Swiss-Prot record:
Stretches of the chain forming a coiled coil according to its record: 842-1938
MF GO annotations: actin filament binding; ATP binding; calmodulin binding; microfilament motor activity; protein kinase binding
Phosphothreonine: modified positions: 379, 1277, 1284, 1311, 1515
Swiss-Prot/TrEMBL domain comment: The rodlike tail sequence is highly repetitive, showing cycles of a 28-residue repeat pattern composed of 4 heptapeptides, characteristic for alpha-helical coiled coils. Limited proteolysis of myosin heavy chain produces 1 light meromyosin (LMM) and 1 heavy meromyosin (HMM). HMM can be further cleaved into 2 globular subfragments (S1) and 1 rod-shaped subfragment (S2).
Pfam family, one: Myosin_N
Subunit structure: Muscle myosin is a hexameric protein that consists of 2 heavy chain subunits (MHC), 2 alkali light chain subunits (MLC) and 2 regulatory light chain subunits (MLC-2).
Region called Actin-binding, residue ranges: 657-679, 759-773
Protein name stated in the entry: Myosin-6
SMART domains the record matches: MYSc
Organism whose genome encodes this protein: Mus musculus
Matching InterPro entries: Kinesin_motor_dom_sf, Myosin_head_motor_dom-like, Myosin_N, Myosin_S1_N, Myosin_tail, P-loop_NTPase, XRCC4-like_C
Family in the record: Belongs to the TRAFAC class myosin-kinesin ATPase superfamily. Myosin family.
GO terms (BP aspect): actin filament-based movement; adult heart development; ATP metabolic process; atrial cardiac muscle tissue morphogenesis; cardiac muscle cell development; cardiac muscle contraction; cardiac muscle hypertrophy in response to stress; in utero embryonic development
Domain IQ: start-end pairs: 783-812
Length: 1938
């Protein structure tokens, strides 16, 4: 379509198709199909990328965001050429894969082209904004257009369906599917808008209606949407206008394609939203529209405010939506009601019920006092809702709180709890809303129903998309099940039926399984014993619960179906009970409340009120409601009444869904897939993973593949022959008969098309995608040619007729002129005047006769027309009714067929089950006999146990009596405690007064006083209860002995019962397994039950008896549990004996429970066995289920009680232990306090005031005493601990003394070693100073050397630049030379050999230099920052390396001796270090303890003084009392005695501390001696180190001489370099001469430049890679010689270049292969280099760590001289560090050896052809490296050697840094050269592009010139024809005139 044609779409054109300019730009965009690709990405699924390289099945690509990735080659997917950008049909993509489809959709979406074809269906992406693509202009533009003639659009899909309906005479359907928020509802509205616009009823006069508000049928169809959306749409998390119901809209058309009528079917209204919404969601729109206050009269009528937060049902989530104007929507809804011809009463009824639901949510109820029943908490809202519903408020509240329930044949009033009332209100509100919505749909259908004839229909399906929420319930299962069925229908239609059609037609086709079969999931949900079936079955049983439903699901499906899984519950999320694997993902479902939702129960009392409501609409809604009891009573009237009342929600949904699928299968479906681009509702943003998930789930990619692989278009042979015969009429002659198939074969065979694009079936010809469009284009072109020819002939004929008319006119004019002249001559005759008067009169008479005849004929025709119209209307009405009946009959036949199939399957299954069950019944009868025998035995055992239980009960009764006595005594003691606490309250007041007087001591003593008061209370109570408790203990001990005997008997009985219990449990397990297998099958076997009736009745009676006994035992267990609880609480407050007794009682009760449990287990076994046989009768099913539920509850309760009792036992044991501890403490306190308390109680009556004051003082004393006792206890514990530690120390000291005696023997040797170390340290310090001076000079020398080195490297860089230039020129000349070498093959072979040799040499040099550079670069990169600090160590290590080479043998001997001594000293030092550490820690501990004890002693002394002062005060106060002085004196003496004891204990502790201090002092002295010895040894080591430093200085001198020699060798290398520069200059001159010669041959080489450029690029890459690798001078000289030889050869062969071009091309290919090989080798070397760098980096970091640790060790060693303990720790660390360094050193030595060995090999290979000077230098380098290696080996066992190896590494680091700088310079030079080369290439490419553009311009001008010449020729021929024609006309005129 051109831009001019797209102008018909108006402003929507830019949103539908790219302009011609954009298409042209896209086609001319640069694109390389080899490199442009898609690569996988973790975040974006796929990203665009360019291939950088391919190697070994791996591809390296650079993504569009600059990231480089390496992936497998099969993961790379090619991009489509630019002309396919934003393609409208993705089936036409060249490369069809996931990223191509994704990016096509993404690019179109970015341009706001939201519709895209995908094979046979359409994909639409939600734009989240308004686009102008749905106006009337666009509708008109799409009308009658073929799919290929217009851009993709929902209107195009709709028009195609409309055209198919008319041409194929078949019903159509449009299935709009997608996730929630993808835009399904909007597209549905657009489809309806399109049909209403293009297929409106033709005659406008018929649309006129006397009722102005009703509107036309198309208006009513369009206005049905706003009405339904107001009541059925709501805001959700993902969509602001989400349809919460599904709808199938059928638009009926007449035979001519005009609208006839419409109807709507709805599915699954989400009625739970009426009473509950999530936070981010809201209720249905109608509630907020009413509350928007746009129509205030509505608020007054409904008695509501305009604040949504006043109503609970509508304010749980959000109350407003930014994208929706509720007030405007209210007007739209109200006007929609008017257009749909709702009456005012109906509208008011709908609004009233909506308002009543809001008032329902505000009704409040509360619980009656002392009852569980509910009563109203205010009646205002109930009054409002009752008024709006036309009810009585009191009756409504009564029905809610006290509903009438039918029990048997009578009705009983039942009281409801508050929760039950609220649940009932919610259920009623949901039911009212749902029934009102369904009534609205029925009412709208009645409006849309017309008497017009209906021939066909187009159905539009808009149903809720697949839903996966955090909380998925029954509604989500129904919605997802519906989507599963629709997806299966899509898959079946697209994949299965399509391929079955091919096989049926006999086309060669291999069946492709696209893996899209969803039948397993569908069967899991809907088949017998599926989820829905089990749910409906559970709803039939009154005792069933959600958990029994879950258990059945698990039993039937877990592990048996792959689609049914156990969920993974995550903390923080809602609990899930099972998971289903749907096509769109795995969904976790929560089954809570499913049974209630499925049964959907209502309060039938309130429903009865609804049925009698004065509001007509309310009574209508519930007029058809029938409960279970009404169903029973209505048996006689109608058989279906009862069945309908028991129909569950799931069954109703399945029935509606099956009808929908049946309807869809009879239509031709058109699929529209809606895609949600992102979760944020952001326009223009596409989330790639989200879109890819939807594409995979929706089968978009599979649809495209089947469209491309299969044959989506097919035509019957007859239709094809009739339509396309025009393409070649000669192939099918008209005169003879030819079979339609043969005619089609001949016709297609004669056409110029791809004959693999179609296949012939038995009845149809099949076409691949696109071929039918091509045939249509050919047909249109043929028709246009034929029509053009016809038009030409017609125009010619018309012109000839016109010419003839002109001639006739001319002749007529001549005749008229002659007649006029004649008339003018006779007009005045009298006879002529008479003629003029008579003539008109004759004609008027004739016309009157004709008019009369016509009127008569008109009357007859009018009568006939009226009769035919009446007859036609009757026939049309009959036809409509017959069609409806036919459709209904078809549905019934289909349903009957399905039922018949199900019945047959069930019959077969029942026959099989019957055989199995008969065999199992026999087994069961045998087992029943065995069980009866076992039952008899168990009953006997049970009697014995009952006897034992009775005996135990007697014992328990006795125990209960004793417990009752204990309880009474406990209460008495508690009363006494209360009295005492009252008295103590008075004491507390006095204490408070005294504490005010003693403010200084308030904070310290207040808490102690309170604690003491509480203890005194306890003492009072305990002393009083002690005597009584002792008596009770004696009684309890006697009963305890009896209980022990009973316990032993019970133990024996328990063991016996446990054995029996195991046997019964095994038999129970077997029976349970059999029961689960037979449960469902035995329901359908009624005819076998009669044989077992008598046995069942007996068993039932026995079960009832056992059940009664079980209840009695259970009651008895509960009583025992209560007794145990009471006993547990009492045990918490009594002593050890009571706790022991309670434990014994608990064990007895536990044994009793076990004995009772055995009987209960037996009862359960009998009951289960009874339940299995009772299941054989349907009448006993309910009783069996009740027994099972009761048994399960008892089992659970019993298990819970046993577990609880076990926990109680554990708790009581813990409490018992705690009480035992408290008892022991209390006994100790009682012994101390009882005497004091007795004396205080005696003195209390006489001296109350004095006693209180004295008691206060005594309390203070006691507090202090307790503190003293605690501190004394602490001291005693510390003393005991110190004594043990002293004992340990004494033992250790003895060992140390023995060890010291051994150490003293080696003391002399150690002291000598320490002196040596000190001397070494001093020498090393002096050497450091000397080295510092030497460092400055060496730095100066190093700077000079660095400058020389830099100059040398600059010169080397210049050499490299010249060399690279020469190499490039040589490569150019070599290519030219090779092109001309056709006649000199022998010379070319020699050149090839030389080139191969050069390449080999280059590779060897590359390997050598690469190895050397890698080692140097690695060491340099890391240690660059530390080079200044490490220079001293470098010089020192160089000097040491030279000097130590001479003294190696002597030093090795000395080193071995020192090593031995060092190890011995280290071991001794370790032991002494450990001893020192332990002694120091002990010393610190003792010091701390001593200080603490001193502090305590001081505090005690101060407290003693205070106490003495207070005692003196008390004695004065006691003097006044007189009588109690003697008693108080005793108390004082006791306190003094205790004080003296404390003092003596403190003195003993002090003495022990002094003793320990003496020991510690002795240990310190010994420690100081050891430290002094160690210091002396360190001094000796320092002296040795100084000596080593002096040796190092001598080595530095020798290294200086070697450096001078190195400088001289470098100067010699500079001289050689300068000489080579001169040689290179001469070669440049020669090359310039050769260039002048070569310029003459450039003209002949243009044809081969394209090949040479690629080769040149590859050679340049190889040269650059070699330049990066530091080539040496020998290779440069050898190449120069080769270059001179080649230049001479090139001069000789320049003239022959043209003849040798063809041979050179072949040689170029071989050379490029060699270059690629070289490049791959270079890359491998570089990778190896990087690996070695990383290894060396790791080694360097480890060495750095070792150096740092060594430095830390040195500092710690210095500190060790001043602090022995710290020195020992640092020595230990030094020892660990040295061991670590030794290991590191060995690894470093091995690594350096490997690297050195490789370096030597590389240098030997690289320096084969070098000069002697270079060989000397390399030999010198190898000598130095050998010396370094020897030095590293010699110093391997000591820390000194480690430091020297580190310094050597630093030297290498410095050298590497210099080499790195040189390499950087070389790299810069190479980069400059590469830039120049790129510039030359760019210039050449620009010239080539300019040439191409000039050539294209020339071709264009040439083409235009040819066209102009053709036009001139055509014009000239036309002029000649016109001239000839004019000459003929002139001649003809001349002839006529003659």
């Amino acid at each position: 379509m051109t831009d001019a044609q797209m102008a018909d779409f108006g402003a929507a054109a830019q949103y539908l198709r790219k302009s011609e300019k954009e298409r042209l730009e896209a086609q001319t965009r640069p694109f390389d199909i080899r490199t442009e690709c898609f690569v996988p990405d973790d975040k974006e699924e796929y990203v665009k990328a360019k291939v950088v390289s391919r190697e070994g099945g791996k591809v390296t690509a650079e993504t569009e965001n600059g990231k480089t990735v390496t992936i497998k080659e099969d993961q790379v997917m090619q991009q489509n050429p630019p002309k396919f950008d934003k393609i409208e049909d993705m089936a036409m993509l060249t490369f069809l894969h996931e990223p191509a489809v994704l990016y096509n959709l993404k690019e179109r979406y970015a341009a706001w082209m939201i519709y895209t074809y995908s094979g046979l269906f359409c994909v639409t992406v939600n734009p989240y904004k308004w686009l102008p693509v749905y106006n009337a202009e666009v509708v008109a533009a799409y009308r009658g257009k073929k799919r290929s003639e217009a851009p993709p659009h929902i209107f195009s899909i709709s028009d195609n369906a409309y055209q198919y309906m008319l041409t194929d005479r078949e019903n159509q359907s449009i299935l709009i599917t997608g996730e929630s928020g993808a835009g399904k509802t909007v597209n549905t509205k657009r489809v309806i808008q399109y049909f209403a616009s293009i297929a409106a009823i033709g005659d406008r006069s018929k649309k006129e209606n006397p009722n102005a508000n009703k509107g036309t049928l198309e208006d009513q169809i369009i206005q049905a949407n706003p009405a339904l959306e107001a009541f059925g749409n709501a805001k959700t998390v993902r969509n602001d206008n989400s349809s919460r119901f599904g709808k199938f809209i059928r638009i009926h058309f007449g035979a001519t394609g005009k609208l006839a009528s419409a109807d709507i079917e709805t599915y699954l209204l989400e009625k739970s939203r009426v009473i509950f919404q999530l936070k981010a969601e809201r209720n249905y729109h109608i509630f907020y529209q009413i509350l928007s206050n746009k129509k205030p009269e509505l608020l007054d009528m409904l008695l509501v405010t305009n604040n949504p937060y006043d109503y609970a049902f509508v304010s749980q989530g959000e109350v407003s939506v930014a994208s929706i104007d509720d007030s405007e929507e209210l007007l739209a809804t109200d006007s929609a009601f008017d257009v749909l011809s709702f009456t005012a009463e109906e509208k008011a009824g709908v609004y009233k019920l909506t308002g009543a639901i809001m008032h329902y949510g505000n009704m409040k109820f509360k619980q009656k006092q002392r009852e569980e029943q509910a009563e109203p908490d205010g009646t205002e809202d109930a009054d409002k809702s009752a008024y709006l519903m036309g009810l009585n408020s009191a009756d409504l509240l009564k029905g809610l709180c006290h509903p009438r329930v039918k029990v048997g044949n009578e009705y009983v009033t039942k009281g409801q709890s508050v929760q039950q009332v609220y649940y009932s209100i919610g259920a009623l509100a949901k039911s009212v809303y749902e029934k009102m919505f369904n009534w609205m749909v029925t009412r709208i259908n009645a409006t849309l129903e017309t008497k017009q004839p209906r021939q066909y229909f187009i159905g539009v399906l808009d149903i809720a998309g697949f839903e996966i929420f955090d909380f998925n319930s029954f509604e989500q299962l129904c919605i997802n099940f519906t989507n599963e069925k629709l997806q299966q229908f899509f898959n079946h239609h697209m994949f299965v039926l399509e391929q079955e059609e091919y096989k049926k037609e006999g086309i060669e086709w291999e069946f492709i399984d696209f893996g899209m079969d969803l039948q397993a999931c569908i069967d899991l949900i809907e088949k017998p014993m599926g989820i829905m079936s089990i749910l409906e079955e559970e709803c039939m049983f009154p005792k069933a619960s959600d958990m029994t439903f879950k258990a059945k699901l698990y039993d039937n499906h877990l592990g048996k179906s792959n689609n049914f899984q156990k969920p993974r519950n995550v903390k923080g999320k809602q609990e899930a009970h099972f998971s289903l694997v749907h096509y769109a993902g795995t969904v976790d479902y929560n089954i809570m409340g499913w049974l209630e939702k499925n049964k959907d129960p209502l309060n039938e009392t309130v429903v009865g009120l609804y049925q009698k409501s004065s509001l007509k609409l309310m009574a209508t809604l519930f007029s058809t409601y029938a409960s279970a009891d009404t169903g029973d009573s209505g048996k006689g009237k109608g058989g279906k009444k009862k069945g309908s009342s028991f129909q569950t929600v799931s069954a109703l949904h399945r029935e509606n869904l099956n009808k929908l699928m049946t309807n869809l299968k009879t239509t031709h479906p058109h699929f529209v897939r809606c895609i949600i681009p992102n979760e944020r509702k952001a326009p223009g943003v596409m989330d790639n993973p989200l879109v890819m998930h939807q594409l995979r789930c929706n089968g978009v990619l599979e649809g495209i593949r089947i469209c491309r692989k299969g044959f989506p278009n097919r035509i019957l042979y007859g239709d094809f022959r009739q339509r396309y015969r025009i393409l070649n009429p000669a192939a099918i002659p008209e005169g003879q008969f030819i079979d339609s198939r043969k005619g089609a074969e001949k016709l297609l065979g004669s056409l110029d098309i791809d004959h693999n694009q179609y296949k012939f079936g038995h009845t149809k010809v099949f076409f691949k995608a696109g071929l039918l469009g091509l045939l249509e284009e050919m047909r249109d072109e043929r028709l246009s040619r034929i029509i053009t020819r016809i038009q030409a002939q017609a125009r010619g004929q018309l012109m000839r007729i016109e010419f003839k008319k002109i001639v006739e006119r001319r002749d007529a004019l001549l005749v008229i002129q002659w007649n006029i002249r004649a008339f003018m001559g006779v007009k005045n005759w009298p006879w002529m005047k008479l003629y003029f008067k008579i003539k008109p009169l004759l004609k008027s008479a004739e016309t009157e006769k004709e008019m009369a005849n016509m009127k008569e004929e008109f009357g007859r025709v009018k009568d006939a027309l009226e009769k035919s119209e009446a007859r036609r209307k009757e026939l049309e009405e009959k036809m409509v009714s017959l069609l409806q009946e036919k459709n209904d009959l078809q549905l019934q036949v289909q349903a009957e067929q399905d039922n018949l199939n199900d019945a047959e399957e069930r019959c077969d299954q029942l026959i099989k089950n019957k055989i199995q069950l008969e065999a199992k019944v026999k087994e069961m009868t045998e087992r029943l006999e065995d069980e009866e025998e076992m039952n008899a035995e168990l009953t006997a055992k049970k009697r014995k146990l009952e006897d034992e239980c009775s005996e135990l009960k007697k014992d328990i009764d006795d125990l209960e009596l004793t417990l009752a006595k204990v309880e009474k005594e406990k209460h008495a003691t508690e009363n006494k405690v209360k009295n005492l606490t009252e008295e103590m309250a008075g004491l507390d007041e006095i204490i408070a007064k005294l504490t005010k007087e003693k403010k200084a001591l308030q904070e310290a003593h207040q808490q102690a006083l309170d604690d003491l008061q509480a203890e005194e209370d306890k003492v009072n109570t305990l002393t009083k209860s002690k005597v009584k408790l002792e008596q009770q203990v004696d009684d309890l001990e006697g009963s305890l002995e009896q209980e022990k005997k009973v316990r032993m008997d019970l133990e024996r009985a328990k063991r016996k019962l446990e054995g029996d219990l195991k046997l019964t449990q095994e038999s129970i397990m077997d029976l349970e397994n059999d029961k689960l297998q037979l449960e469902e099958k035995l329901k359908k076997k009624e005819f076998d039950i009669s044989q077992q009736n008598s046995k069942i009745e007996d068993e039932q009676a026995l079960a009832l008896q056992l059940q009664k006994k079980l209840k009695e035992n259970q009651a008895r267990i509960e009583e025992l549990e209560e007794e145990l609880e009471a006993e547990r609480t009492a045990r918490a407050k009594v002593e050890k004996l009571r706790s022991d007794l309670s434990r014994e009682l608990e064990e007895i009760s536990e044994r009793l429970e076990e004995a009772g449990g055995a009987t209960s287990v037996q009862i359960e076994m009998n009951k289960k066995r009874e339940a299995e046989f009772q299941k054989m009768r349907r009448d006993l099913e309910e009783a069996t289920l009740q027994h099972e539920a009761t048994a399960a509850a008892l089992r659970k309760k019993h298990a819970d009680s046993v577990a609880e009792l076990g926990e109680q036992i554990d708790n009581l044991q813990r409490v018992k232990q705690k009480l035992e501890k408290e008892k022991s403490e209390f006994k100790l306190e009682l012994d101390d306090v009882t005497s004091n308390m007795e004396q205080i109680i005696k003195a209390k009556a006489n001296l109350e005031k004095v006693s209180r004051t004295l008691e206060d003082q005594a309390n203070e004393y006691r507090v202090k005493l307790e503190e003293a006792q605690r501190s004394l206890n602490d001291f005693t514990t510390q003393r005991a601990k110190l004594q043990t530690e002293n004992g340990e120390l004494a033992r250790q000291l003895e060992e140390k003394e023995a060890l010291i005696s051994q150490l003293t023997r080696g003391k002399l040797s150690y002291t000598q070693q320490m002196e040596d170390l000190k001397r070494q340290l001093e020498e090393e310090g002096k050497a450091k100073n000397a080295l510092a001076h030497a460092l400055q000079s060496s730095r100066h020398d190093c700077d000079l050397l660095r400058e020389q080195y830099e100059e040398e490297m600059e010169a080397k860089a210049e050499l490299q630049r010249v060399l690279s230039k020469a190499n490039s020129e040589v490569a150019q000349w070599r290519t030219k030379y090779e092109t001309d070498a056709i006649q000199r093959t022998e010379e070319l072979e020699e050149a090839k050999k030389k080139l191969a040799q050069r390449l080999q040499d280059a590779e060897e040099a590359v390997e050598a230099v690469n190895a050397k550079c890698s080692s140097l670069e690695k060491t340099k990169h890391r240690l660059q920052n530390e080079i200044e600090d490490l220079m001293v160590d470098v010089e020192r290590s160089n000097a040491a390396a030279a000097a130590l080479d001479k003294k190696q043998r002597n030093f090795d001997k000395i080193l071995a001796e020192w090593k031995q001594k060092y190890e011995e000293s280290q071991s001794e030092l370790e032991s002494s270090q450990k001893e020192a550490r332990s002694l120091s820690t002990e010393l610190f501990k003792l010091k701390n303890a001593y200080e603490e004890s001193l502090e305590h002693l001081e505090t005690f002394k101060r407290e003693n003084k205070n106490l003495q002062e207070e005692i003196s005060d008390l004695t004065e106060q006691l003097g006044e009392g007189g009588k109690n002085v003697h008693e108080l004196e005793k108390i004082r003496k006791q306190l003094e005695v205790e004080k003296l004891e404390l003092q003596s204990a403190l003195e003993e502790a002090e003495a022990s501390l002094e003793h320990e201090e003496g020991k510690i002092l002795r240990a310190q002295l010994e420690f100081n001696q050891i430290k002094a010895e160690i210091e002396r040894k360190l001094a000796e080591k320092d002296e040795e180190m100084e000596q080593a430093k002096r040796n190092h200085l001598r080595m530095v001198d020798s290294l200086q001489t070697s450096l001078d020699a190195e400088t001289r060798s470098r100067n010699e290398a500079l001289r050689v370099k300068k000489k080579m520069e001169g040689d290179l200059n001469e070669m440049e001159i020669q090359l310039s001469q050769a260039n002048r010669i070569a310029s003459e041959a450039q003209k002949h080489l243009k044809n081969s430049q394209a090949h040479l450029k690629d080769t040149q690029l590859q050679l340049d890459d190889a040269v650059h890679a070699n330049d990066d690798l530091k080539e040496n001078i020998a290779i440069v000289e050898r190449r120069n010689n080769l270059l001179q030889a080649e230049l001479e050869e090139l001069r000789a062969v320049v003239e022959q270049t043209e003849r040798s071009r063809k041979l050179a091309e072949q040689e170029l290919i071989e050379t490029s292969e060699r270059v690629q090989l070289l490049h791959s080798q270079n890359t491998s070397l570089i990778n190896q280099k990087k690996k070695m760098e990383s290894d060396l980096t790791q080694l360097q970091t480890e060495v750095e760590e070792a150096v740092q640790e060594c430095r830390n060790a040195e500092e710690k060693a210095k500190k060790a001289i001043t602090d022995a303990a710290m020195m020992a720790e640092e020595l230990k660390k030094e020892q660990d560090t040295s061991a670590h360094l030794e290991r590191m050193k060995k690894n470093m030595e091995q690594t350096i050896k490997d690297l050195q060995h490789r370096l030597d090999e590389a240098e030997q290979i690289a320096l084969k052809g070098g000069k002697k000077q270079l060989q000397k230098l390399e030999a010198r380098v190898r000598e130095l490296e050998n010396e370094l290696e020897a030095e590293q080996k010699r110093n391997a066992e000591s820390v000194k050697g480690m430091r020297k190896s580190e310094r050597r590494i630093k030297e290498l680091t410095y050298q590497t840094e210099e080499d790195k700088k040189n390499l950087m310079r070389l790299q810069d030079l190479v980069d400059k050269l590469q830039l120049k080369v790129k510039a030359y290439k760019r210039q050449a490419e620009e010239a080539e592009e300019q040439a191409n553009t000039n050539l294209s311009k020339f071709r264009k001008v040439q083409h235009e010139l040819d066209e102009a010449e053709e036009r001139a020729d055509i014009a000239e021929s036309q002029v000649n024809k016109l001239r000839a024609k004019s000459r003929d006309i002139g001649a003809k005129k001349m002839h006529d005139e003659e």
